[in-house]
């Protein structure tokens, strides 16, 4: 669970680790730490393990789909993800509306074999630079739980900082990736569309 995406790819290529092992390690880390820092609103253990098994088969055949094949990835809970609800950190949205399509960045990662783990917490409608919401409560900074991890991608940054996955997908209009990354000591990029 402490390996970077690049290290995992090297291990997959060398058959020193498999996508299924990586997924199981990430899920175990989530089970150990999520209650303490409140990162995930949704964890899809069954889907994660199934996607990891499919990725493992591709790697064993020497046919990975791309540079993220088998890499565990979390998704900020504002990005549409096929089969999952997207609640925007709010009680105003219905949890009974799983989407039948992916947002473009989710679709691109899925096309290249990413293993999606779950949805990370965000501030309500990702509108402030702390990660708390009436839906999920407060996400804690992993290095000092009395401090904020920043926002609105605080859940994503804490997931990466604590080894609950090497990659997290977020959004950034006014610092929503950059602020949490600086508060938790991880690297983040403001994406373009």
Language-model regions: role of each:
Residues 8-12, 55, 156:
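Generic hydrophobic alpha-helical segments
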Residues 67-105:
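Enzymes and membrane/adaptor proteins characterized by extended Gly/Ser/Thr/Asp/Glu-rich
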Residues 45-68, 75, 95, 99, ...:
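Flexible, acidic active-site loops/lids enriched in D/E/S/T/G that coordinate Mg2+ and/or position polar
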Residues 99-193:
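Short glycine/serine-rich loop segments
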């Amino acid at each position: 669970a402490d390996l970077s995406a690049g290290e995992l790819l090297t291990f997959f290529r060398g058959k020193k680790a498999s996508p299924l092992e990586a997924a199981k390690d990430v899920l175990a880390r989530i089970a150990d730490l999520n209650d303490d820092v409140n990162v995930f609103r949704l964890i899809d253990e069954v889907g994660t393990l199934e996607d990891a098994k499919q990725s493992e088969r591709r790697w064993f055949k020497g046919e990975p789909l791309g540079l993220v094949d088998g890499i565990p990835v979390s998704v900020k809970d504002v990005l549409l993800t096929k089969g999952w609800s997207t609640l925007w950190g709010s009680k105003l949205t219905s949890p009974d509306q799983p989407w039948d399509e992916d947002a473009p960045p989710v679709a691109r990662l899925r096309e290249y074999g990413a293993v999606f783990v779950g949805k990370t917490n965000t501030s309500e409608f990702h509108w402030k630079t702390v990660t708390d919401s009436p839906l999920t409560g407060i996400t804690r900074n992993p290095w000092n739980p009395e401090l904020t991890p920043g926002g609105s991608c605080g859940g994503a940054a804490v997931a990466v900082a604590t080894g609950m996955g090497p990659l997290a997908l977020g959004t950034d209009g006014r610092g929503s990736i950059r602020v949490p990354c600086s508060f938790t000591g991880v690297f983040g990029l403001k994406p373009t569309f």
